Regions:
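Helix-centered, glycine/charged polyanion-binding patches within enzymatic domains
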Residues: 65-66, 71-145
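Polybasic low-complexity intrinsically disordered regions
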Residues: 1-88, 92, 148-154, 162
Length: 169
């Protein structure tokens, strides 16, 4: 975050974190996406230093039939069951200590990851079509508002052919 402001301060609501040897400052965007339609139904913004498992309750709306997630969500099965009682949990299994995982589990994780890849499509449209690169505002609330409006437009963009077909019929 820039310090080119009157206070010469970084945004106090955003924090820094490290991934490998690289340091990042800012916020993280977590989205919930319908696995069939690919449309984003929820978006949560957290500071960069918050673990990915914490916004799970805000990402689930309760009517899910299946929940997909990476191995960071593997320890959150109870939380997922409490928030979405009718949903089957399809989170990836973690590898054992030493990194060994049998081929059957690896094949299941690969199949789950193919479905999970649909979560990345709204991010691609947000970045490539709408040109989202950096945050514009100080504070998480303003940036969340901008991102929610952007994801509403992303959903319209993703279903534009269907909408045009119904409008001309």
């Amino acid at each position: 975050s820039s310090t080119k402001n009157a206070d010469k301060q970084r945004d106090p609501e955003m924090h820094q974190t490290r991934k490998g040897q690289q340091w990042y400052f800012g916020m993280k965007l977590h989205i919930g996406v319908d696995s069939r339609s690919g449309l984003a139904h929820s978006a949560v913004v957290t500071p960069a230093n918050v673990h990915d498992k914490h916004p799970i309750p805000q990402l689930l709306h309760g009517a899910e039939q299946r929940v997909y997630g990476d191995s960071a969500y593997a320890s959150q099965k109870d939380l997922i069951q409490a928030k979405a009682p009718g949903a089957k949990d399809f989170t990836n299994q973690r590898s054992r200590k030493g990194g060994h995982i049998d081929e059957a589990v690896r094949a299941k994780n690969r199949t789950k990851s193919r479905v999970r890849a649909r979560v990345e499509h709204p991010f691609r449209i947000l970045k490539c079509v709408f040109g989202f690169r950096k945050v514009c505002y100080r504070g998480i609330a303003k940036n969340l508002n901008r991102l929610q409006v952007s994801f509403a437009l992303v959903n319209l963009y993703m279903k534009r052919r269907t909408l045009i077909r119904y409008a001309t019929a």
